[in-house]
């Protein structure tokens, strides 16, 4: 029995030593688990960021693709419209005689004028390209003068077309619905402001002689005065029209009041009839400004001026196309 005690004690000591090592091992295991959990959390954050970046890149590609598709659709629509206009011209919708044209405007109104303007603009662009080629080729003054005169005559044609269109629908012509949205922002009484056009040209045609600068300044001043007079006339017409329509508002529907109402409408209609006159005067001012500008400038300067005017209008139309085709977000 005595011999058994040491072995029993030794066994007990070994067991105690094993128990003393277990807390350290547990701590190491806990630390290892914590590191693994932390690494796993960091990996998840990284994966989430990568997923978010991929999603943002995907959405960016989709937006870019949609924008490109909208531009392509706009180009296709423009091509389709040009083809429809070409077919319409081949079918004889555009009438050459002024009497028949006026009758056509009465029947087709705004649509007929819009199609006429598209045809005019197509021919105008062709003539501008011809002028640009002549300028770049350093053509002589005689050749340039022939192209410049042709473009000036073409401007007279659109003024005549606007006059005919106004007889059918003066509101359509005045509002500029036949123009692109960006062009309408700068519209004045159905067209460009002569004074603003001269201001643009004076900075684009340098160098100019003192006599030319003086001539353009005087022309700009007289154009501005004429514009102010027409604008004031339009304001007076609007005020008078508003007062006429506001008369006896809210009155009962008796026979006398009905007759009064009809009388007011007749007066208002008569006043609206003067809108056509305002448009005609504004177009006359525009036409005279172009003619005076041609007299002040040399042939080569006149050619450059027509190119500047055309390029400015083209940029406004391009801006409208880009604006309408932008992503709608």
From Swiss-Prot:
Q: What PANTHER family does UniProt report for this protein, alphabetically?
A: TRANSCRIPTION FACTOR TGA2-RELATED (PTHR45693:SF46), TRANSCRIPTION FACTOR TGA9 (PTHR45693)
Q: Source gene?
A: TGA2.3
Keyword Transcription among UniProt keywords: yes
**Residue runs in coiled coils:** none
Q: Name one Pfam family in it.
A: bZIP_1
Which segments constitute the bZIP domain? 43-87
Query: Where does it primarily localize?
Result: nucleus
Q: What are the start and end residues of every segment in region (Leucine-zipper)? A: 71-85
GO terms in the biological process aspect are: defense response; DNA-templated transcription
Name a GO molecular-function annotation. Answer: DNA-binding transcription factor activity
- Record text on subunit structure and interactions: Interacts with NPR1/NH1 and NPR3/NH3.
Q: Family, per the entry? A: Belongs to the bZIP family.
What protein name applies here?
A: Transcription factor TGA2.3
InterPro entries (alphabetical): bZIP, bZIP_sf, TGA_domain
Q: What residue spans carry the region label Basic motif?
A: 45-65
Gene3D superfamilies, alphabetized: 1.20.5.170
Compositionally biased region (Basic and acidic residues):
33-46
Q: What does this protein do?
A: Transcriptional regulator involved in defense response.
Please give the residue ranges the record annotates as the region Disordered.
Answer: 1-48
Outline the extent of the DOG1 domain. 110-326
